[in-house]
Amino acid sequence: MSSYLFTSESVSEGHPDKVADQISDAVLDAILTQDQRARVACETMVKTGVAIVAGEITTSAWIDLEALTRKVITDIGYDSSDVGFDGATCGVLNLIGKQSPHIAQGVDRKKPEEMGAGDQGLMFGYATNETDSYMPAAIHLSHRLVEQQAKIRKKKNSPLSWLRPDAKSQVTLRYENGVVSAIDAVVLSTQHAPGIKQKDLIEAVREEIIKPVLPAKWLHKGTKFHINPTGKFEIGGPVGDCGLTGRKIIVDTYGGWARHGGGAFSGKDPSKVDRSAAYAARYVAKNVVAAGLADRCEVQVSYAIGVAEPTSISVTTFGTGKISDDKIEKLIRKHFDLRPYGIIKMLDLIHPMYQQTAAYGHFGRKPKEFSYLNGEGETVNATAFSWEKTDRAAALRADAKLK
């Protein structure tokens, strides 16, 4: 019998790298609200007392960058010097320039469907049927732990009012013959106010954060819990560590279970295939698994800058396919348009929905209907996490001629 351990981690919305991601995506959202043709590549750095927002942006929109940055920081919970960082008083430095016209000439075309990729690169998408979210279980549970930490922290009259925004989680699972059999270890580190006794913190975190999230069927007497194992975690957020956009690409995707092309997501408009093609690859892989064509599926796509058609599409199902990987690849080419314009249209990506992707994972989330007012004051309806739909599974299954 094959037995092995696998570990994934996640971080909270108050982790400094995630603060940076959320600022970058808030800038993108604010611009897309007014200008759907904008080109945005926004990078953020946060450190004690300052947020630096830089990058290349070409747009007709105007946004109050300073006010927007401050709002993101305070909404996360960094709203006082008592927590070490205050969005109301920190410095905000604007270092934004315009996108190179040489890139623009390769992307923008007279015919929208001929739109070229914004850069070269390779992207991966993955799905598995081991969880209802079609995500690997370790990253799924790691996200839910830090999400629960934030939920309890922000709750009115919270029993854990001493929680602070910064937190990290890690889950180690035991697999037997490729199937999750148990949770071997859990790590939960959370920033907290001074004066909290370690014993009280451990008990509260276990009862209010860990127990509501982890499946009881996978817990056993030997499961190890490491809660704030250093003893104190009072200094956190941008004071404890410098935060940068794009530093949590494994947390953002599949927790190390699938391969990664190296490109980050946050702060990039959908013309950047680092983001849009990774979303499309997840959409494809999830529909393949939801269709029952495989238990696990990884899809790779690649692009050349200024070229519309992908330079490659490849599929691997790790021996779990009900039909051959070659046949699945042919079905993908038939049912999905993976040119940049095709992806944007297929997933309806040009809407202000990206800040909510910047914490707790870009994948494994439920599609969410919402509406907003655009630059003309019109109400627009849209769907966030559209790449999590399984609306093409039935057609794939029928075309594969599976009963």
Curated annotation (Swiss-Prot):
A GO cellular-component term linked to this record: cytoplasm
GO biological process, one term: S-adenosylmethionine biosynthetic process
Record: residues binding ATP: 15, 166-168, 232-233, 241, 247-248, 264, 268
CDD domains tied to this protein: S-AdoMet_synt (cd18079)
Binding site for Mg(2+): 17
Catalysed reaction equations from the record: L-methionine + ATP + H2O = S-adenosyl-L-methionine + phosphate + diphosphate
Chain positions recorded as K(+) binding sites: 43
Cofactor: record remark: Binds 2 divalent ions per subunit.
Cofactor dependence: Mg(2+); K(+)
Signal peptide annotation: none
Keywords in alphabetical order: ATP-binding, Cytoplasm, Magnesium, Metal-binding, Nucleotide-binding, One-carbon metabolism, Potassium, Transferase
Region (Flexible loop): 99-109
Binding site for L-methionine: 56, 99, 241, 272
Domain of life according to the entry: Bacteria
Enzyme Commission number(s): 2.5.1.6
GO MF annotation list: ATP binding; magnesium ion binding; methionine adenosyltransferase activity
Coiled-coil annotated spans: none
Pfam families named in the record: S-AdoMet_synt_C, S-AdoMet_synt_M, S-AdoMet_synt_N
UniProt pathway: Amino-acid biosynthesis; S-adenosyl-L-methionine biosynthesis; S-adenosyl-L-methionine from L-methionine: step 1/1
Subunit (UniProt): Homotetramer; dimer of dimers.
Cited function: Catalyzes the formation of S-adenosylmethionine (AdoMet) from methionine and ATP. The overall synthetic reaction is composed of two sequential steps, AdoMet formation and the subsequent tripolyphosphate hydrolysis which occurs prior to release of AdoMet from the enzyme.
Family recorded in the similarity comment: Belongs to the AdoMet synthase family.
Name of the protein: S-adenosylmethionine synthase
The species this protein was found in: Stenotrophomonas maltophilia (strain K279a)
